[in-house]
Amino acid sequence: MMEAEEQPWKTTFYSKLPKVELHAHLNGSISSNTIRKLIAKKPDLKIHDQMTMIDKGEKRTLEECLQMFQIIHLLTTTPEDVLMVTKDVIKEFADDGVKYLELRSTPRGEDATGMTKKTYVESILEGIKQSKEENVDIDVRYLISIDRRGGSSAAKEAVKLAEEFFLSAEDTVLGLDLSGDPSAGQAKDFLEPLLEAKKSGLKLALHLSEIPNQKTETQVLLNLFPDRIGHGTFLSSSEEGSPDLVDFVRQHQIPLELCLTSNVKSQTVPAYDQHHFGFWYSVAHPAVICTDDKGVFATRLSQEYQLVAETFHLTQSQVWDLSYESISYIFASDSTKADLRKKWSHLKPHF
């Protein structure tokens, strides 16, 4: 009985905790409320919201999760759709106590509606701008995603767009994300555009070691010295892990973006208590808790922090430190980091 009474208070701690979200795919972060608004605009598609979300206790294969994105893409085909989605997602993160957010999304053109990759990016930037003008209490930046399925030519196009907006979008576009189906393409296809991006001053967040048996692929990407690693699920696992890869990541102190619900629901990790957060936390390696796709996986960042705390027996003080330390891994400037640290200090409860 006591535990049930404590639960709302505990939940309040996690939702009030100021948080940084560094691994959030825009289209995967669309809530069921927003999905319903999009469905209402396109009734002929005969899509219902259960086709885009994995409920509590349910699981899908990674492949099935990726297929859900195809459905979501059918719903976001105009600049107006993208603008609405961006604003809704930003507001929902802010409502969950997220104070700094790096959204990521692959620029997408739609011949039928006339949306180009450039207007897609502009719609996201407009959503960020309007949210700021409406005083939503969150600092939002954008990473342009390279979808592995698009191959080298789409990657080069994404880098060009990122370079263009990096110079013109007032510090909003900060870097690139390499993501999409981890079995599509090869790392070497993306080396040239990613190196070009690095030379331009863009930051790199690379999904790697998401699936087993990718040691060579992982090493190729690590040789780029990415600024952050997405998932890194099999870097440290006893069956597939490689001590030299782990040593490389530790030696270069490359932060990991870790997404518990996503990994368990997509079955790349068998159970929460076997999540690789445990390994990296035990060696005091930089790691940041993230949602990945809060819409698809029906989660919130406060829920992810609660999961981590309860699974790995962290105190409130340790949870606070985990959140505070994540400020160090953002792609924005040192002055932004200093502002966020001030904000955290101001909001810090007495433990």
From Swiss-Prot:
Q: Kindly state the subunit structure of this protein.
A: Monomer.
The protein's annotated catalytic reaction(s) are: N(6)-methyl-AMP + H2O + H(+) = IMP + methylamine
Q: Which residues form the active site?
A: 210
The entry sums up its family as follows: Belongs to the metallo-dependent hydrolases superfamily. Adenosine and AMP deaminases family.
User: What InterPro entries does the entry give?
Assistant: A_deaminase_dom (IPR001365), Ado/ade_deaminase (IPR006330), Metal_Hydrolase (IPR032466)
Which keywords does this chain's UniProt record carry? Answer: Hydrolase, Metal-binding, Nucleotide metabolism, Zinc
Cofactor note as given: Binds 1 zinc ion per subunit.
Protein name (Swiss-Prot/TrEMBL): N6-Methyl-AMP deaminase
| Binding residues annotated for Zn(2+), in chain numbering | 23, 25, 207, 292
Ranges in a coiled coil: none
What Enzyme Commission number(s) does the record list for this chain? 3.5.4.-
Q: Where is this site: Important for catalytic activity?
A: 231
Tell me its cofactors: Zn(2+)
Q: Which GO terms describe its molecular function?
A: adenosine deaminase activity; metal ion binding; N6-methyl-AMP deaminase activity
The UniProt function text for this chain reads: Catalyzes the hydrolysis of the free cytosolic methylated adenosine nucleotide N(6)-methyl-AMP (N6-mAMP) to produce inositol monophosphate (IMP) and methylamine. Is required for the catabolism of cytosolic N6-mAMP, which is derived from the degradation of mRNA containing N6-methylated adenine (m6A).
- Please list the residues that bind N(6)-methyl-AMP: 25, 27, 73, 105-108, 147, 180, 210, 292-293
Q: Which GO terms describe its biological process?
A: adenosine catabolic process; inosine biosynthetic process; nucleotide metabolic process
